[in-house]
């Protein structure tokens, strides 16, 4: 790692260009195909770096005591409220693994970097970096990573955890990211300070809880133009985010009035046991200017929605426009063109439904199946709404204590 004071004096700036690694990396600390860790006071720019090829240059992350451990939290390295890396072993702390660099600081920039190798680490691992506190632009992961099982968490195609800025960086269409908790195509966990901006999102993401085509768990900002992903999870599964938290925002890119909406494209499929949506499995924050055209959103039971499976936040200016052989379906629960369930405090405003909704054994609504919140300025037209039991409604199947 470039962290020796004798080599890199405090405040120095370093640019490394066109570096390549073809060897396997094994370590118990910060693991990166190019650099393990960059000192916080060193300004580092990596340009056109690449790691490995399809069969070489694995980055294997281990477990060891953290030199920056937080004693108040049992020695676990705390990255963000709610994120602790001490889960695997109570006596040790997880470190970070990335195809290019284990952990980026605020002064680290990655430009046009590509990882062709694998990343083998169960916690806080990413195609380019385990944890990003800096800036990543035009990055790409070509290989696959992870395993769809408990214990694998905070895994992302670009960064396991993002506290910085990621722009136009995503896995290849053939890449797969697999894990248990907070698994995303770009970032597993996008913190409140994290910003992800994309023209196009691709890839395949498989998880258990909070699985998303861009971010598994989003507390920050995600803006995109086009999303074509295949996402599968057990609960809170979405084309963009598995769980969009109260502080999270999902919006179009660029964020200007004349821009087209963020579009979840026909090639997208979302499958979940509970809480599945074209944009978010569960929304507690803000989703606006999004259009769902996904080829398939299928939920075994509970909530299926064109935009969000369940909503307690705000969904503004969004549209479900998937019809014909494109499926929005729940086998035994509640299906809605915008949200399967609009909970207490949930707001659906200026939303449009022009697609199909099916609840095989439950309730189906053009906007939402169950409404406990508010629905204003909504429009339903040219739609096919089907249910085999209970209630069906053009706007909502059942208005519990909400306002329409």
What are these regions (language model features)?
Residues 1-404:
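Surface-exposed loop/turn motifs in large extracellular/passenger domains
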């Amino acid at each position: 790692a470039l962290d020796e004071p004798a080599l890199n004096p405090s405040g120095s700036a370093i640019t490394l260009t066109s570096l390549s690694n073809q060897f396997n990396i094994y370590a118990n600390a910060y693991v990166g195909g190019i650099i393990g860790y960059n000192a916080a006071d060193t300004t580092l720019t990596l340009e056109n770096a690449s790691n490995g090829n399809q069969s070489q240059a694995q980055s294997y992350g281990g477990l060891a005591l953290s030199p920056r451990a937080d004693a108040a939290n049992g020695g676990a390295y705390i990255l963000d409220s709610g994120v602790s890396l001490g889960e695997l072993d109570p006596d040790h702390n997880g470190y970070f693994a990335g195809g290019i660099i284990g952990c980026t600081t605020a002064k680290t920039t990655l430009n046009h970097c590509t990882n062709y190798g694998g990343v083998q680490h169960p916690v806080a691992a990413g195609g380019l970096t385990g944890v990003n506190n800096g800036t990543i632009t035009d990055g790409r992961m070509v290989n696959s990573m992870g395993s769809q099982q408990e214990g694998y968490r905070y895994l992302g195609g670009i960064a396991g955890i993002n506290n910085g800025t990621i722009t136009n960086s995503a896995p290849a269409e053939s890449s797969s990211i697999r894990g248990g908790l907070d698994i995303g195509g770009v970032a597993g966990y996008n913190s409140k300070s994290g910003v992800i901006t994309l023209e196009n999102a691709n890839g395949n993401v498989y998880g258990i809880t909070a699985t998303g085509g861009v971010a598994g768990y989003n507390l920050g900002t995600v803006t995109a133009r086009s999303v074509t992903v295949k996402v599968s999870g057990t609960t809170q599964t979405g084309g963009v985010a598995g769980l969009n938290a109260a502080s999270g925002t999902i919006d179009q890119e660029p964020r200007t009035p004349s821009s087209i909406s963020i579009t979840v494209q026909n090639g997208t499929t979302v499958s979940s046991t509970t809480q599945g949506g074209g944009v978010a499995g569960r929304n507690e924050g803000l989703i606006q200017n999004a259009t769902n055209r996904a080829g398939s959103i299928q939920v075994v039971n509970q909530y299926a929605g064109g935009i969000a499976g369940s909503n307690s936040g705000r969904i503004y200016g969004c549209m479900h426009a998937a019809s014909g052989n494109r499926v929005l379906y729940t086998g035994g629960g509640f299906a809605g063109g915008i949200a399967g369930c609009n909970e207490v405090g949930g707001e659906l405003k200026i939303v449009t439904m022009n697609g199909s909704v099916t609840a095989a054994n439950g309730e189906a609504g053009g906007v939402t199946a169950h409404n406990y919140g508010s629905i204003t300025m909504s429009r339903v037209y040219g739609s096919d709404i089907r249910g085999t039991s209970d209630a069906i409604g053009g706007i909502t199947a059942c208005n519990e204590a909400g306002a329409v």
